[in-house]
Amino acid sequence: MLLPKELKYAAIAGGVAVFGLIFGWVLFPVILKGQLKKEMALSKKTDVRKMWEQIPFALEFKVYLFNYTNAEEVQKGAKPILKEIGPYHFDEWKEKVEIEDHEEDDTITYKRRDAFYFNPEMSAPGLTGEEIVVIPHIFMLGMALTVHRDKPAMLNMVGKAMNGIFDSPPDIFMRVKALDILFRGIIINCARTEFAPKATCTALKKEGVSGLVLEPNNQFRFSVFGTRNNTIDPHVITVKRGIKNVMDVGQVVAVDGKTEQTIWRDACNEYQGTDGTVFPPFLTENDRIQSFSTDLCRSFKPWYQKKTSYRGIKTNRYIANIGNFSEDPELHCFCPDPDKCPPKGLMDLAPCIKAPMYASMPHFLDSDPALLNNVKGLNPDINQHGIEIDFEPISGTPMVAKQRIQFNLQLLKTEKIDLFKDLSGDIVPLFWIDEGLALNKTFVNMLKHQLFIPKRVVGVLRWWMVSFGSLGADIGIVYHFRDHIMRLAVSGDTKVSKVTPEEDPEQKDISVIGPPAQEPAKINI
């Protein structure tokens, strides 16, 4: 049976509307999700893999040093007065090297190489890196703190060794150029032949102290970041590629072939989260993302804070902090001693970096108030000192990230070393870093073209198809049944009767209903 032309048009229009419903609300989300699963996996064919291997633009690496303006008084036990100097801005280039794929368990192994280049134009006005800063002698205090913790009976010998290695220093401070302590290095004189300095330097060489480089003639060169600069990190990291299950992408499963650490207790030794450079897609506000920091030997679990936007893309902001190890059951296993945890907001890094330092938020943000009261000159501000990451939730792409950490040291108080007998024993700040990522315009546009433009086009198209398809179907149906509709409109419940003249020969007035009209009665006045 052939359909009338109007019904054919109506059927076609209705089909368009139905297709718009099915494709726009059912098929397209499935197709988009499937495509994202392929694109976000660390397979060799994806753009994500290329960017994961080598970030094609520099990250911002900013360092803020704390200058001690009252060093002589601090040596006598006074509260330090600090002046923040910075930022010293470095362009940080990151890449992964010695990459190997393992098809059988869907993993990939790699090592890291970071390169830092000082950028005076982006640093604070007037800073060249040649400024002299006064800070606690990191190496000297580190030696004393390590021996005090591990072999306290040898503190007297370490005191004698310090006099030889550091030429009988007048106090526990160093006056040093900013770039020297950060990257270029300061000389540690281990050429002395006296027993105490020689024995101490031999132990240093054997232990492989972090930040220490052996120079000719039994000299050492020490810096905070110099050993990281343009060198391959020895640790081999294994992560999931996410090809079999995209929700596993980037998950750290082993470091140096070991599936867990041995430096903490219980669950804190587990590798939880991604390597911090890639995250799974389809994030919601209720999801707790996780990333593992090999530099701090721990996982962080940022939580959702609020809706944000970046270059026209809607994002979700997540924030994090160091935490409170004594009160948070998940973090209690980071306490080296179960019965004695660091104060709130402080993390003992000694088990991780083999140096007696503490990590905190900059300016002791979200920390025990006592830490802030131990010094003058700090002003914690969550906007300037907090950890925050803005994610595009559908793809899981970090659009903007600010990872901020402060490094602190204890002013060891001990009677066994003259230089240390009058110190306060408080934990004080040395410097803090702000490592920032912000996707440039090129990669934002790439994300828009791959994800948002198709999504918006389909969003408009599906409504157009449903609206105009429904309208076209209605018009076709109405047009086809127009004659029938008109007949129904005319007939309805109304009856039409034919009027014929009566056969009565008496003429009647058609305007009169009822009996024939009679002459009205006359009234006498």
Swiss-Prot record:
Membrane topology recorded in Swiss-Prot or TrEMBL: Multi-pass membrane protein
Any single GO CC term annotated in Swiss-Prot or TrEMBL for this entry: plasma membrane
Which Cys pairs does UniProt list as disulfide-bonded? Answer: C268-C333, C297-C352, C335-C341
Q: Name one GO biological process term.
A: sensory perception of smell
Residue intervals on the Cytoplasmic side:
1-11, 478-525
- Alphabetically ordered keywords of this record: Cell membrane, Disulfide bond, Glycoprotein, Membrane, Olfaction, Receptor, Sensory transduction, Transmembrane, Transmembrane helix
> Which coarse location class describes where this protein primarily resides?
membrane
Going by the entry's taxonomy, the superkingdom of the source organism is recorded as: Eukaryota
Name recorded for this polypeptide: Sensory neuron membrane protein 1
- What lineage is this protein's organism placed in? Eukaryota, Metazoa, Ecdysozoa, Arthropoda, Hexapoda
